Each structure stands twice: as C-alpha cells, then as structure tokens.
C-alpha cells in the first residue's frame, strides 16, 4: 500500500533555487564511470523538511549519535558530527547522492556562490546501505555520517541537505532536511513566567522572555542585522522568525514583553510504543499479523479540549526508533507496521482539516497524516506506516484557508504543559553577505 504525498497548502518558505553541481568520479563493482561535466539545475525547491518519493520512510537526521539531538553542530568541530539514516521501501535500492546549500535565517537560499560556503566536492555519495532481514515489509536502510573532509561547510548558519538520485533534477529528488552550523558568540537566556502580559491568555498560553547577551560583538546596526528564531518542540509551522528586540541595551538585547513570543500551551503528547510486537504496551488495543504486514490498533481516543491537564512524561513529540529484542539490529531487522488511530468526534469539521502531528510524520502536514472522517464510526481515522519504536503524537487542526495549526479543538491548551523551546540567534555579516548562526539554546517551559 503506497501513500501519496502533498504539502499542506501554501508554503511560506517556497523559493526558487539554482544549483550548480560538479560531478566527481565514482566506482561501482570495479567499473569506473567517467566524471560528468558541470551541469546546472534550475527548479523550484522549498528550503524545508520534505519527502518527494513515496518509498522514503523513517528519515532521521541528528547530532552526536543521539537520535533526539537536533542537527546543530559547531563550526570549529564538524567532521562526522551528523548522522543521517533512512529507509526506502522495497527490495531494491537506489544509488543516492547528497549535497547541501546555505540558507538565510528565514530559510531562503543565500545569495552565495558555492565556493563561498563549502570546500571540496559539490556532492557526495551515500554508499553505506543494507537490506532488511526477516521482515514482512522489505526495505533498504541507508546511513551517512557527515560532514566529510572532502565536502565541508565553511560558514555558520542554516543549511538544507538534499538527497537525490543521478543528476539533481526535480524528478530525482528523494527528500530534503534542515541542519545548522553554529559559531557561538552570544548567550541566550530564557524565562517562562507564570502569567502572560495579556492576562486573558495566562491559563492557555506560554510567553517567553528572552535576552541575548553579546558584549563582544555589539554594533550600532544590531537591530537591523540581528534576527531571533523561536521554535516550540520540533515544530516549524508556528516558528517565529526574524524577531527584533523590544529594547537594546549596551551589552544585551531584550525580547521581553513581546506579544510575538506568546505560544499556545498545547498539551502533553500521546504515546505509542510497538518496539515489541508480542506485547501490548500502554494504550494499544491489539497487535496482529497478516500475511503481508503487522497492524497496531491504538485505543480509541477522545478529544482533550475540555479535560483537565494531566502531567506525564513524554519526549515532546519526538520518536525513538528501536526494536525491543537484543538479538535484532534495529537498522535492518526492525519491521514496519500500520498504526491505526481513531479520534471520536461528533461531526466533521467544516473549515479545518485534522492531522496527526509530531515526529511521527517528521512534523509535516500532508495526505499521509491527514485524518478522514468516518460517519459510520463517528470520528476521524488515520493509518500510518511506521518502523518499530516509540512515538509521540498529537491531534491538531489546520485551517483550510490560512494553514494555521491549532490544538484548541482537539488537544486543548494549558499554561503548565511541558514544552521545549529552541532559540536561534542570527547576525547578518555584510562582508560575507550571509546570515551567520551565532547563538543557540533550548529551554523548557516548566
């Protein structure tokens, strides 16, 4: 069963990208294939986390060997710090390449020639792969450690990783993922007060008060050149970008008492763990096997919009891929299963679509994680193909006109929800003509 992908509505980070890729020789089964010439590619490409092939599954991009560590690496110690892993469904793999481009603070392509932000080759090959073993669903697992010495970023800032086959054309794209290179020069301090400046939001929202200490690089143009980005958990849909300070002091910038730093409190994420197909963990109604695949039925869910807040441990919407069998290798012996989710709801929404949000679908909103209303059952259904592991997820709505995502109708909003906020401070370098990432931190709301 294949899933058709479609991005959600308008993409604010849609951009035109012109890539020039210099081909280098490669060897396959002792056959030398000559170096291809310089070829220019010209097509539209969003600088966002997106999948372009149905076969792409379980993409992980993380730092320092930790699946849940964001792909942010230091400029002065980059080699091999990032790990990329993913699966392609089926019994035959593809010869895949990767490259990256430098982006602005708000995820548009930088106006830089490649030799200004990268040293070495223009692309690399992903040649570490293995075939699934003893699984009902066949797949090919790929892994890559990068950056490598023969293709290394030169500047700090935002980067888009691009994985593709053959020549870099729109038809050959497999997926794209964001990562960052940090040249830390400032300190970011965050507090989350109990009450918002707008007291009417204090029970449902969280407001961040932020200061950026930068005594060594303070310039008279910092209000123009400095930009702050704030993300809630792993989300990009509600990220605040290009934030300017409310007040400028001699040695720090203040982003306190700013309505743009107010976020919906949301709720704790729901959890599902099917790392073991022979044990029904919390909230799993049943697990069964067909001739072709495993099926995991999650317990019937009820909206939490009007229910009291309950605190329990989650991993803030992330996922952790593993198989609970010491004798199995997760990379190639973990199987896939269809996860069935059902949210009881009295009637279909008229102006919103309902989605399953989280790293369970790489924080994307597309046909894959959009729920469909079943009149006979009286609720929304969704079926997701997932690799064995532990997942967090949340039911959310997306307005069909604005694409804005909210939790008030499905999960509810609470001031005391445990959220993780990620903050990035960029400074535009007029000499290098690019946005440099010079500050990064994470903070928990409670």
Located regions from the model:
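Short acidic/polar inter-strand loop motif in beta-rich domains
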Residues: 105-107, 151, 165-174, 276-283, ...
